[in-house]
Amino acid sequence: MNKFNFQNLKKPFIIAEMSGNHNHSLERALQIVDAAAESGVDALKLQTYTADTLTIDKSDGEFFISDPNNLWKGESLYSLYQKAYTPWEWHKAIFDRCKEKGIVCFSTPFDFTAVDFLEELDCPIYKIASFENIDIPLIKRVAQTGKPMIVSTGMASLSELDDLVRTAKENGCQDLTLLKCTSSYPATPEGTNLLTIPHMKELFKCNVGLSDHTLGIGAAVASVALGATVIEKHFTLSRADGGVDAAFSMEPAEMAQLVRECNTACEALGEVSYEIQEQEKKSIVFRRSLYIVEDMKAGDRITEKNMRSIRPGLGLKPKYYNAVLGKKVVHDIKKGTKLTWDIIENFI
């Protein structure tokens, strides 16, 4: 797993983000692993933190979520993170289940202690969350592991992105993927701005993907057409079960559809080609071509009445229609005869 390389991807790398959708049940967490693997994803991602590594136990002022439009309104930051965190003692069991099911398991560390803990589990990839993409010391510490890094870019300015990319590369990261991300839960299609993906790829000379908080699969599939190589979506067994992130998470059948359609989009990109494809050759016969549509005698002239451009495509191409109008035929012709040069006077 330590040799995983995002430079060698042949298809989109699809990540199911468990986040807090385990609802504080290890059994449910393992069921999420099983369902994710069954849906065809490449990886399952955890988040490694505690409420105390993210904030302080304070429930007023700026530590309280009062925005009526916020998904987590009425919570303090501390109480929210207590509900959402994945107990560290579960990590090994989840990593082991992922290995058993044939998918990659990795995590997002939120402080140095989480990095140290994940290194003991031989975590093969590290993710930096959007809210931490300005935490340069953390980015530096993760880069120093030498593992591939994925960084969500939500809320980051261009200069902040430059800071994080430089920090990662200067501290040993040779395999960096930036994820276009809109840090809104859920995100709207009009606020997703997928056209940033090819620009970001060109600007920072690295792989680019999408951390997708929109509902449905449309944005993810479209991102593949724009060059996204990594797709991350939150994942749960059922939104009806509730949970801190359930409202914008994919269910198993939806994730399976996302995997299929992203792979189809990738295959369909192909290459720039104006050649007849091998699979098209049998269809050539059904193109239009010039045919005689009335019985004709030798010496009769070709007219708009006795010649038409019709299917099938075995006669002269329609572009010769005007060139042969008024020309004589050299022998009797039956209705339904394809027009060829050898039956036209002066074209033999």
Predicted regions and their residues:
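Catalytic cores and adjacent flexible loops of soluble metabolic enzymes
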Residues: 1-348
